[in-house]
Amino acid sequence: MGQRIPVTLGNIAPLSLRPFQPGRIALVCEGGGQRGIFTAGVLDEFMRAQFNPFDLYLGTSAGAQNLSAFICNQPGYARKVIMRYTTKREFFDPLRFVRGGNLIDLDWLVEATASQMPLQMDTAARLFDSGKSFYMCACRQDDYAPNYFLPTKQNWLDVIRASSAIPGFYRSGVSLEGINYLDGGISDAIPVKEAARQGAKTLVVIRTVPSQMYYTPQWFKRMERWLGDSSLQPLVNLVQHHETSYRDIQQFIEKPPGKLRIFEIYPPKPLHSIALGSRIPALREDYKLGRLCGRYFLATVGKLLTEKAPLTRHLVPVVTPESIVIPPAPVANDTLVAEVSDAPQANDPTFNNEDLA
């Protein structure tokens, strides 16, 4: 049997790890709607430390969106999308849903972010040229089979839409190559099995719920009783399929087969944010928690997965020479002009000052 190592605040299991040969490393990100703000925090901490030893990336729904920002090396991007765009009424509108429209407008979200905050796909292309692969999971609408798409400049945004098309809330689904797709979380919310199938020996899995959370059977029984004889019966069948798949994935993570090693990063308790309709303060708290969990992972596990240690947060103190030269004082009314970097997201003040703990 393989090995599962839980990584969260308050868990000391990572502290007892010994050096090992990781082999092919995969980064797998769970969906979860706005709960993906936790994943955004973890991945922003990875980017701050320039930590990217992964050979393979797999994500579903919000996990695919977060990984897109990580692969394009845009720190702060996913946090902005979740906190500034998914909280707008243009995206999430219960009144529109009651009137027969979509509860979530993925078309608006994708178009707005693409025009105002485009992904740096050229950066990702160079990563792919080096031999690394990224797969986004979407689920076929006809038989619920999971499909894994390699994004290109031409289809990247369409695949994100397909992977995030929550059934019932985005009624039409997304058509790719003549086939209708829905949210990949229906059949493969955490694509760990696909990562293992593609040869990964070490998996770093970022969850958006505490580990070992299962669905409550009583909840399903009530829903079946309420909706069993209605026109929503297909939706009940779909949710049951998702529940069975999710339970199977959870058991795979808890008891990895063979010599597979799984590092599971997860929040120590349920997040303040929810899948849709979260408040800004809740999102901010969960983002900070993700940053802290990412930092804990880097301090304990990160150095074992790469030959080059992750960058530390604190710099080595500068030795001051004995003779100190004091420059002339600036004119009192001079305006301080800060140097501006052209790097994507580099001038995001909220990101730079976020969570300095």
UniProtKB/Swiss-Prot annotation:
Residues 27-196 form the PNPLA domain. One of its GO terms (biological process) is lipid catabolic process. It is an enzyme of class 3 (hydrolase). Its EC number is 3.1.1.-. GO terms for molecular function: hydrolase activity. CDD domains: Pat_hypo_Ecoli_yjju_like (cd07208). A motif (GXSXG) lies at residues 59-63. A motif (DGA/G) lies at residues 183-185. Gene3D superfamilies: Cytosolic phospholipase A2 catalytic domain. It holds the Pfam family Patatin. This is Uncharacterized protein YjjU. The keyword Manganese does not apply. It comes from the Bacteria. Keywords: Hydrolase, Lipid degradation, Lipid metabolism. Probable lipid hydrolase.
